[in-house]
């Protein structure tokens, strides 16, 4: 007979005062809120999965400061006031023969986020005071797969990408605030081979094709990781 599914469901709601990025100044009441849920379970005895949704919102951000620069001897700092919202999606799939990952296993992982903002940018310290309307949309996602083909060996690939679409009434002010980057589409391809000596040490060889600057950047890494002392159990 097949193994009984072990489904799980998690729901969480968090209220905050809006005093941490990407919100702005703390408020006396509820300045931000966050809700997320995760569901998952087993498919037979060799497969399992988990999916999650999250949403964060700060409807009244006040004076969130960001990029600054010197102009004619004075320092100008970009401050955003308006609304900010972030939505996220994540998914994990795991495979192991008859539920035993010691010899072979595979893990597929995906995550996506999107931030939407609407409000105004003010260059604090400018004289006369400079401002611009601002509507921004930033997206990012990655997908990766790791296959352990022997007890001590694993290989994997990964793809990352982010994009922006920022609009406003004054492009010069958005550029000063480091927000005038509608054509910015950085991406990266990665591949790795890993040898695990034990639970506490591993050696990884990794190659990245990084296009975050618009140019091809070939990167090679050799990484050795080890753990000293006891450590907690791994999460899903």
Segments the model singles out, each with a brief description of its role:
Residues 1-61:
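Aromatic- and glycine-enriched pocket-lining scaffold segments that form the walls
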Residues 46-179:
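Detector for outer-membrane/organellar transmembrane beta-barrel domains
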Residues 89-91, 195, 217-236:
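Outer-membrane beta-barrel "beta-signal"
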Residues 4-9, 42-51, 96-106, 152, ...:
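Short loop/turn motifs that connect adjacent beta-strands in outer-membrane beta-barrel proteins
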Residues 182, 186-203:
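C-terminal structured "cap/appendage" subdomains that terminate the fold
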Residues 29-33, 83-87, 137-141, 185-189, ...:
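Residues that define the transmembrane beta-barrel architecture of outer-membrane proteins
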Residues 12-16, 50-56, 109-113, 158-160, ...:
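Transmembrane beta-strands of outer-membrane beta-barrel proteins
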Residues 1-4, 39-41, 93-95, 147-149, ...:
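Residue-level signature of outer-membrane beta-barrel architecture
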């Amino acid at each position: 007979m097949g193994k009984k599914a072990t489904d799980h469901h998690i729901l969480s709601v968090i209220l905050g005062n809006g005093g941490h990025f990407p919100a702005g100044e703390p408020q006396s009441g509820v300045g931000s809120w966050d809700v997320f849920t995760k569901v998952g379970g087993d498919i037979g005895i060799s497969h399992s999965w988990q999916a999650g949704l999250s949403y964060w919102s700060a409807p009244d951000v006040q004076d969130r400061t960001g990029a600054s620069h010197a102009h004619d001897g004075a320092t100008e700092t970009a401050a955003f006031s308006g609304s900010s919202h972030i939505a996220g999606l994540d998914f994990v799939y795991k495979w192991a023969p008859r539920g035993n990952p010691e010899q072979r296993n595979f893990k597929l992982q995906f995550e996506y986020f999107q931030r939407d903002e609407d409000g105004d940018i003010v260059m604090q310290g400018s004289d006369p005071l400079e401002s611009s309307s601002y509507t921004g949309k930033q997206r990012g996602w990655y997908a990766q797969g790791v296959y352990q083909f022997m007890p001590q060996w694993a290989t994997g690939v990964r793809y990352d990408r982010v994009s922006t679409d920022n609009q406003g009434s004054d492009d010069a002010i958005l550029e000063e605030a480091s927000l005038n980057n509608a054509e910015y589409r950085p991406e990266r391809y990665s591949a790795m081979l890993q040898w695990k000596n034990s639970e506490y040490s591993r050696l990884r060889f990794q190659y990245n094709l990084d296009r975050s600057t618009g140019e091809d950047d070939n990167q090679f890494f050799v990484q050795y990781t080890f753990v000293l002392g006891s450590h907690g159990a791994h999460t899903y």
